[in-house]
């Protein structure tokens, strides 16, 4: 439990931005059982559909609860492997900014999660997310703290990214 889903909704509200749900959570909730390796490809396809539907609306900012990197990482974490077509697509569809939620919140079991999620398992998953995102050249900002401070940390990261992006566009416009 990193507070990612709650944070996604709060950020979308703060920035008046469209947001996506977590395809794996939705998929498994519909199935009513734990995820299996045979579910990875349908989850990935659903994730792509969710992203593509959201991206078509012309907004300047989108908040995704997860993307294909989550599918890749959890598949490796749970099953030790992932279908080969997913990783190249992760890189091709890489988001502009990733907020990596810390594991500093108290763990709360939900029906989606596999295992007991011991502190060591949570740290391993967090480290795997950090290394895969970094290895794939993703722009990553850490988000930690509790409650409103966590939200403010995330808002600050996005505002900084937006201002840097706007400044880069302005410099490009000036040089043309």
Regions inferred by a protein language model and the residue ranges of each:
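Walker A (P-loop) phosphate-binding loop of P-loop NTPases
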Residues: 1
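Conserved substrate/cofactor phosphate-moiety recognition/catalytic segment
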Residues: 9-52
């Amino acid at each position: 439990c990193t507070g990612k889903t709650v944070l996604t909704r709060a950020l979308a509200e703060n920035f008046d931005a469209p947001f996506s749900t977590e395809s794996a959570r939705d998929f498994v909730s519909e199935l009513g059982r734990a995820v299996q390796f045979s579910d990875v490809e349908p989850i990935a396809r659903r994730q792509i559909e969710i992203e593509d539907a959201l991206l078509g609306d012309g907004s300047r900012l989108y908040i995704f609860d997860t993307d294909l990197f989550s599918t890749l990482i959890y598949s490796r974490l749970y099953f030790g492997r992932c279908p080969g077509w997913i990783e190249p697509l992760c890189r091709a569809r890489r988001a502009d900014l990733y907020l990596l939620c810390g594991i500093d919140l108290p763990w709360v079991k939900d029906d989606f999660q596999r295992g007991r999620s011991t502190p060591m398992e949570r740290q391993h998953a967090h480290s795997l997310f950090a290394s895969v995102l970094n290895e794939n050249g993703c722009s990553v900002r850490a988000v930690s703290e509790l409650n409103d401070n966590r939200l403010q940390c995330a808002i600050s990261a996005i505002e900084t990214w937006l201002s840097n992006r706007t400044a880069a566009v302005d410099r490009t416009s000036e040089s043309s």
